[in-house]
Structure formats: structure tokens, C-alpha cells
A protein has these predicted regions:
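Glycine-rich, positively charged N-terminal anion/phosphate-binding segment
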Residues: 2-8, 23-72, 80-122
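Alpha/beta enzyme core
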Residues: 117-131, 135-147, 155-237
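Hydrophobic faces of well-ordered beta-strands that scaffold small-molecule active sites
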Residues: 18-22, 43-45, 104-108, 131, ...
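Alpha/beta catalytic cores of nucleotide-metabolism and tRNA/nucleoside-modifying enzymes
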Residues: 1-10, 14, 18, 24, ...
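Active-site beta-loop-alpha junctions enriched in small/polar residues
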Residues: 23, 48-50, 109-111, 136-138, ...
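Short secondary-structure boundary/hinge segments and terminal tails
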Residues: 53-54, 60, 141, 218, ...
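Hydrophobic alpha-helical membrane-association signature
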Residues: 154-161, 299-300, 320
Length: 357
């Protein structure tokens, strides 16, 4: 049987098991749309602060919902941020559905369950297909506030966050699935992914994504896929595996070795959205073909044009620089292209750079 197969996450049915991870600074609506074109079956927004979202709803293009129950957050004070339109557009692009995304989840983080409830309750206009609670981010500015992987130090916090997100989903979002992303643990002396996953499931989570590194490891060393294998054997909801997926062969190996339901590409997809179609080809046929540079050029320009349509050409060209670095990593003459891109200020500038590559 093919390793490429459908995945059922609560009430959500997905046609395949190749997912795009939330990656801060990269997985905005334009990149997620590109990845969907290339075969990503499910994608996640960059992590969004629940606190920031509900306190700055205008910036995110949302509005306070009308009260429809005593538990509605509509009567709670909200502070509009007053940002300029371009800043607002950038924020909106973090959480809105991409042009070609058929299925996507909005990922929230926050140490306070009340913040998660309020934020999740505002998401109905965006029509996400799931809410994902980030309990694995190792970044200091997230962890210092007790969110992200810091929640694994007190697994009961994960349960509270999931429970309140499920409640918000039921009351305001039609009961869409709530999922959770975790790590192996805080450090090597506190490997507690199984406990955290079980608590999340008891609170209502219907999928667990495991990045099998500790918070102390950050992204160093090798991820321990045996933790994924173990978790699959312990729980009944789908487990999505993440960590060290850089090639189609890596995806094939993880699915075979761990028995996970799906794989989630993160750094391996940055600048390489083609990894999804390549991985599907390998899983279904046993082989895959590299994408010609001409196709890569076309994707780079389409990505830039989508950004420009939403945040303006000048801002898009600045934002594209980091994406361009990822797209040109490892190709002949890539360093020279990246040097030229530093000075690119228009779509025409980027097109000229790519045509001369």
C-alpha cells in the first residue's frame, strides 16, 4: 500500500499526509499558497500570539463578534493597535487563507487559557479548518512568557489551553478540530511527550504533532524519531512527525520507520516548495525528478507577485529578500544572485536577476 494516504483529523478529512509546518518569518499566505500548488495537503500559519491577536483585532482584519452567549468575549475590552495600513496588511497575511489553500490551520500560542479563548473566538471570518496550539516553540521571547515549549514543564497548562480552545471552537467556529504541536520535552531530564500528548487528547485534541527534540536542543543535533514511533504506539489519534525532513527520501523513511500518519516539512520546505510534489511522487511511484531551474524562477516570481498584491510592491520586495535567500540556496551562482537581490526594489529588478541567472 502506498505511503501517501488520506488523514482524518477529527471531522476534517485530508486527501494526503504531506503537511507544511508553521515557520516564523516564512509561511505567510503567499508561501502557503505556493506550497499548496505544489502538493501540500495541509498547512499551518506562522505562530500567532493569542494575546496580541485579541488585543489588536483591527490589525488582523477582524472584529469583535456579537454576543451570543454569556461566555462570549464580545463584552471584554479590546485595544485597537492603530497601525498603518501596510503594517495591518502584513499582520492579516500571517493568518488568512492562501489563494490556493484548500485546508489550513491557524496556530496560536499563549500561556493564558483566557487569551486563547478570546483569540480563537475571533477567527470565524477567516474560516480556518483547524486551530493548532503551539506547545513546542523554543524561541526565548515565547518561552519567557510561559508559552510554547515552556508549557511542557507543566503539562496541565497544555490541557487547559486545549480545553478552552475546544470550547471556543464549539461556540464560535462550528466545532473545527483542535490540534497540538509539542517537543520531546523541556530537556533530556524531562522527556514527557507521551504525558503531554495524553493530557492534550483528554482535553479534546484530535492530532498531535511531535518534533522529537527537546527545548534545550533547539534545532541542534539530530531529532530522535524513536519518540515518534513510541508515541504512535501509545495514542489513538493521528501523530504527525516533524524534524530533519529535508528530502523526499526523509519523508519516506519517517513514514516507514515510525508509522506516523503524516509528515510535516519545516526547514526542508523553505525555498523548496517542490518537496511536496517530489515526496508524493516518491511515495506513490518510487521515484521523483528534480524541478528545472526555469520552473523555480516561475515560482519565485509568482510568490513575489502575490506578496505585492497584498502588501505593496516596495514592501513585498523587501520581504522577499529572505525568501529569495532560501530559494537560491545551493544552486550554482546563488551567492551572486543573493547579493543582487539585496538591492532589488521592484518586481522588475527581481525578474531581471532571475533572467540573468
Amino acid at each position: 500500500m502506498s505511503l501517501y494516504r488520506p488523514v482524518v483529523i477529527g471531522s476534517l478529512e485530508l486527501p494526503g499526509n504531506l503537511f507544511l509546518a508553521p515557520v516564523a518569518g516564512y509561511t505567510d499566505h503567499a508561501f502557503r499558497s505556493i506550497c499548496a500548488e505544489e502538493g501540500a495537503c495541509f498547512s499551518f500559519t506562522e505562530l500567532v500570539s493569542a494575546e496580541a491577536l485579541y488585543r489588536n483585532i483591527e490589525r488582523y482584519g477582524l472584529s469583535t463578534p456579537k454576543a451570543n452567549s454569556s461566555s462570549s468575549p464580545s463584552s471584554l475590552p479590546v485595544s485597537p493597535c492603530g497601525e498603518k495600513n501596510k503594517s495591518n496588511a502584513a499582520a492579516i497575511n500571517l493568518i488568512r487563507r492562501g489563494e490556493n489553500e484548500k485546508r489550513y490551520a491557524i496556530q496560536l500560542f499563549g500561556a493564558q487559557s483566557e487569551s486563547i479563548y478570546r483569540a480563537a473566538s475571533l477567527l470565524a471570518p477567516l474560516k480556518p479548518d483547524a486551530i493548532d496550539i503551539n506547545c513546542g516553540c523554543p524561541v526565548p521571547k515565547v518561552v519567557k512568557n510561559g508559552a510554547g515549549s515552556a508549557m511542557m514543564k507543566d503539562p496541565s497548562c497544555i490541557g487547559k489551553a486545549v480545553e478552552i480552545a475546544v470550547r471556543a471552537s464549539r461556540e464560535s467556529l462550528g466545532g473545527i478540530p483542535v490540534t497540538v504541536k509539542i517537543r520531546s520535552g523541556w530537556d533530556s531530564s524531562s522527556i514527557n511527550y507521551a504525558q503531554c500528548a495524553q493530557i492534550a487528547i483528554e482535553a479534546g485534541a484530535v492530532m498531535i504533532t511531535l518534533h522529537p527534540r527537546t527545548r534545550a536542543q533547539n534545532y541542534s543535533g539530530r531529532s530522535d524519531w524513536s519518540h515518534i514511533t513510541d508515541l504512535v504506539s501509545r495514542i489513538k489519534v493521528p501523530v504527525t512527525g516533524s524534524g530533519d525532513l529535508y528530502t523526499p527520501e526523509d519523508a519516506q523513511k519517517m513514514l516507514k520507520e515510525t508509522g506516523c500518519a503524516a509528515v510535516m516539512f519545516a526547514r526542508g520546505a523553505m525555498g523548496n516548495p517542490f518537496i511536496f510534489s517530489a515526496a508524493r511522487s516518491l511515495l506513490e511511484t518510487g521515484s521523483w525528478q528534480p524541478v528545472p531551474f526555469s520552473a523555480q524562477t516561475s515560482v519565485v516570481m509568482r510568490h513575489l507577485e502575490m506578496l505585492a498584491a497584498s502588501i505593496g510592491e516596495r514592501t513585498a520586495c523587501l520581504e522577499m529578500r529572505k525568501q529569495f535567500c532560501a530559494y537560491t540556496k545551493g544552486i550554482p551562482g546563488g551567492a551572486a544572485l543573493r547579493e543582487k537581490a539585496v538591492h532589488a526594489e521592484t518586481i522588475a529588478d527581481y525578474r531581471s536577476i532571475m533572467q540573468r541567472a
